[in-house]
């Protein structure tokens, strides 16, 4: 079955075979992250992995880190960007567990697994083949597992957001607006960056 990104593009009247360039670039539009045609974007989840010693042996415990609060999550993503971001790639905070990485001047030739597809599974066979992305994920575990926010979450009986999981890659979208296609205006209401991003690209008013 199609993912929510492909499905919602179709619901808005856009043929995914013509217009789909990935999930994360639509979310980037909603987050006001400027994109170049040469950028590749990635959805970056804050996930909970088990504490197995080797990263490859860890289990995907929770792809949403107990639906982590946006305030906590943005602080963690800010920390990840400070420690791991650089001129080549950078991280941007979104909402709850849903965040963004932009890799500048990088071809979009990745095959990546959504974390919600591997709940309760050992992650080894689903890890990215790209060494840079894999190393970012591994390093994120090292810097997040003992972060004070995660220690506080564990003390409250909540799952720690102890790793990033990079997936949902794509490139800058280019949708014809509703005004161009149909000569009409419209509006969209949503709490989700994906839907808001489609709305912005379609030239619709996005109501908060």
Outline where the language-model segments fall:
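Glycine-rich, mobile lid/loop segments that gate access to catalytic sites or pores
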Residues: 63-163, 169-170
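Active-site nucleophile/metal-coordination loop of metallo-enzymes that catalyze phosphate/sulfate
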Residues: 1-77
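Residues in well-ordered beta-strands of folded domains
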Residues: 12, 45-49, 102, 165-167, ...
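A short, structural micro-pattern
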Residues: 3, 38-40, 93-95, 158, ...
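Short, solvent-exposed polar/charged micro-motifs at secondary-structure junctions
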Residues: 3-8, 99-103, 174-176
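Short loop/turn segments at secondary-structure transitions that flank enzyme active sites
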Residues: 17, 50-52, 107, 170-173, ...
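Terminal, contiguous helix-loop blocks that mediate binding/assembly
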Residues: 128-132, 149-208
